[in-house]
């Protein structure tokens, strides 16, 4: 499909579902529109994207992720039986009698599948929180929007929603500025030091206290400590790295050279993935379509592929 044809189809669909301009005006009084200080911001595209005409899909998406995560989490914590010795290892599901001979442990295939799905759903919890910080779960109901964001980030790792909200908008208002953007590196753009500084800037003793309380509650309800370490610690940590790598490091990474540590990576320099829509979703719920996210910060995650087609950036060959 040619880019022009794709744009015409997308624009017609957008116009049909367009919301009142009052919605965007109300949004702009609570959040921040991006800077238009460079031609690279492509100011002509400022009004190309129209948000959904209803909050129903955003709310449904959020509730679906919360509900699915809850079901998989409870299964992982209370029903998975992790092996405690090499003798209990088995790759494929077996009969109940054979499982008892193996100490009742779950198969490695079962454990791996649950871990992979749960880690992906942890990522979905954070992406939903991120949408809440942009007001895009429910554009027309700020209280419901923030309630859902609070629920998601508490289930994710008990981060402080208000603190995340404040720092995230510091990121949008000072994108790629060392010392001003809390998501940016602190002078060393290497992957490991950047990730370490990124995570440490959002953690707190109060968060760890709440995580410890939550772990105690789970144990009192019968959850094995090993399950908590695998499914309540390792899974969200891996999810955090996924979010950082595809949503911060790759989009905002400075170019090579001796001045890399001092380069300003303004929002309009953000990179956008060339992955297909399906791969972009599986990678990080479209968080890798990052130029579009900064161009239209009032677009929910599930409309970022549409935004990419509007922008014409990062299109895969099939759409070029």
From Swiss-Prot:
Q: Keywords in alphabetical order, please.
A: Carotenoid biosynthesis, Oxidoreductase
Instruction: From the UniProt record, give one GO term of the biological process aspect.
Output: carotenoid biosynthetic process
Q: In which pathway does it act?
A: Carotenoid biosynthesis
Q: What induces it?
A: Induced by salt stress.
A GO molecular function annotation here is: oxidoreductase activity, acting on paired donors, with oxidation of a pair of donors resulting in the reduction of molecular oxygen to two molecules of water
InterPro entries the record matches: FA_desaturase_dom, Fatty_acid_desaturase
Pfam families assigned: FA_desaturase
What Enzyme Commission number(s) apply to this enzyme?
1.14.99.63
Give the catalysed reaction(s), semicolon-separated: echinenone + 2 AH2 + 2 O2 = canthaxanthin + 2 A + 3 H2O; all-trans-beta-carotene + 2 AH2 + 2 O2 = echinenone + 2 A + 3 H2O
- GO CC entries: membrane
Q: What class of enzyme is it?
A: oxidoreductase
Q: What does this protein do?
A: Involved in the biosynthesis of ketocarotenoids which are powerful anti-oxidative molecules. Catalyzes the conversion of beta-carotene to canthaxanthin via echinenone.
Tell me which PANTHER family the record gives: DELTA(5) FATTY ACID DESATURASE C-RELATED, FATTY ACID DESATURASE 2
Tell me the protein's name: Beta-carotene 4-ketolase 3
Q: Which species does the entry assign this protein to? A: Haematococcus lacustris
Q: Which gene encodes it?
A: BKT3
């Amino acid at each position: 499909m040619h880019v022009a044809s794709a744009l015409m189809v997308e624009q017609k669909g957008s116009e049909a579902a367009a919301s009142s301009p009052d919605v965007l005006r109300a949004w702009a009084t609570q959040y921040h529109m991006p800077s238009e200080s460079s031609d690279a911001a492509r100011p002509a595209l400022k009004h190309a994207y129209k948000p959904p005409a209803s909050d129903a899909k955003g709310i449904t998406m959020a509730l679906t992720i919360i509900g699915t995560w809850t079901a998989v989490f409870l299964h992982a914590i209370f029903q998975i039986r992790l092996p405690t010795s090499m003798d209990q290892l088995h790759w494929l599901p077996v009969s109940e009698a054979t499982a008892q001979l193996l100490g009742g442990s779950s198969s490695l295939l079962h454990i791996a599948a649950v871990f992979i799905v749960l880690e992906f759903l942890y990522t979905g919890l954070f992406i939903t929180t991120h949408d809440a910080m942009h007001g895009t779960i429910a554009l027309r109901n700020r209280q419901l929007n923030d309630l859902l964001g609070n629920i998601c980030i508490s289930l994710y790792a008990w981060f402080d929603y208000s603190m995340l909200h404040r720092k995230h908008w510091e990121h949008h208002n000072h994108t790629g500025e060392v010392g001003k953007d809390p998501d940016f590196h602190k002078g060393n753009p290497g992957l490991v030091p950047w990730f370490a500084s990124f995570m440490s800037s959002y953690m707190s003793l109060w968060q760890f206290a709440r995580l410890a309380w939550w772990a105690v509650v789970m144990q009192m309800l019968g959850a094995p400590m090993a399950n908590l370490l695998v499914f309540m610690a390792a899974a969200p940590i891996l999810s955090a790295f996924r979010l950082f790598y595809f949503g911060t490091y790759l989009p905002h990474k400075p170019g090579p050279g001796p001045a890399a540590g001092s380069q300003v990576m303004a929002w309009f320099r953000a990179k956008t993935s060339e992955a297909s829509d399906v791969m972009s979703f599986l990678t990080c719920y479209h968080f890798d379509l990052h130029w579009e996210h900064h161009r239209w910060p009032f677009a929910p995650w599930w409309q970022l592929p549409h935004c990419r087609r509007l922008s014409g950036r990062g299109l895969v060959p099939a759409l070029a």
